[in-house]
Amino acid sequence: MHKGLKRLGVITSLGVLLVLIQGALVTNTGSGEGCGQTWPLCFGQVIPLDPPPETVIEFSHRLVAGIVGMLVILMAIWSWRRLKHMPETRFLAVISVFMIIFQGLLGAGAVVFGQSDLIMALHFGFSALSFASVVLLTRLAFEDSNPQKQYAPIVSKAYKGYVIFVAIYSYVAIYTGAYVKHTNATLACSGFPLCNGQWVPDVFTEAIGVQLLHRSAAILLSLLLLVLFIWTVKTFRASRVLVVCASLAMLLVIGQAASGVAVVLTYNATLTLGIFHALLISLLFTLLCYMVMLVTRHKAK
């Protein structure tokens, strides 16, 4: 059942993930102006001739994003028609299309007109939302093929509210990380946990303040997820899905923290670390969104 839709969902999910990674690559390599101030053309050409590396990175990002955008729209329409009996479908379909289009327009606007760092930091956040919505649509297709796997754990109002809060807060943490990248504040603090050898550095220096804000947001997210893990294991041990999700969330945030510290300690010398850092937080956010979907299916006690 839904064999074609499931295949499209998997391909589209991987495609959006690739676009997300390419976007991180563009940011980490400073290739945002690799095609000049022209869009959708690249230096006025449909296909750039003899392009330098930054042009290849930017152009390939645009090309893949365009193809994946069409897949997302197809996925949303197909899901709307075949999975309309599932309450989450229409919301996820609308969000997936809106986010993929909006992030494309935001990227195009940044190339042609330029944008502030505050606005550009939203670009990665929209990518994360797009990825999460497509993955959840795909999950719905798999669930509908096997009704026995349509999980709807019964949880308390407090737990439900906490899961929603952590998911929303994780998006805030994503934004602070993206803002660090767009303000070139990655290395504003050398060393960890100290900042330039100080416990209390000058937070009024913009780059240092931005870096410390992200560190604080990341530490708080780790603590929130630790509470979620303990709460889930102690109270909802019978719900294997929630326990697995909470456990994976802890593993992802540990990897996220480790990769972030490694970026600082290696002076951002390894491109792979920065991309891995972006990948892990996107997977974590998607996992938390899945938990939100699960805990909101039943009316909480």
Swiss-Prot record:
Report which reactions are catalysed by this protein.
Fe(II)-heme o + 2 A + H2O = Fe(II)-heme a + 2 AH2
**Can you tell me where the transmembrane regions are?**
8-28, 57-77, 93-113, 118-138, 160-180, 216-236, 241-261, 275-295
In short, the EC number is: 1.17.99.9
- Give the CC-aspect GO terms: plasma membrane
Tell me the active site. Answer: 58
**Residues annotated for heme o binding in this entry:** 61, 123
A single GO molecular function term of this UniProt record: oxidoreductase activity, acting on NAD(P)H, heme protein as acceptor
The family database entries (PANTHER family) matched by this protein are listed as: HEME A SYNTHASE
Domain notes, please?
The N-half (TM1-TM4) and C-half (TM5-TM8) domains are connected by an intracellular loop. Each domain is formed from four-helix bundles and they align in a pseudo twofold symmetry manner. The N-half domain is the substrate-heme O binding domain and the C-half domain is the cofactor heme B binding domain.
Annotated function? Catalyzes the conversion of heme O to heme A by two successive hydroxylations of the methyl group at C8. The first hydroxylation forms heme I, the second hydroxylation results in an unstable dihydroxymethyl group, which spontaneously dehydrates, resulting in the formyl group of heme A.
Protein name in UniProt: Heme A synthase
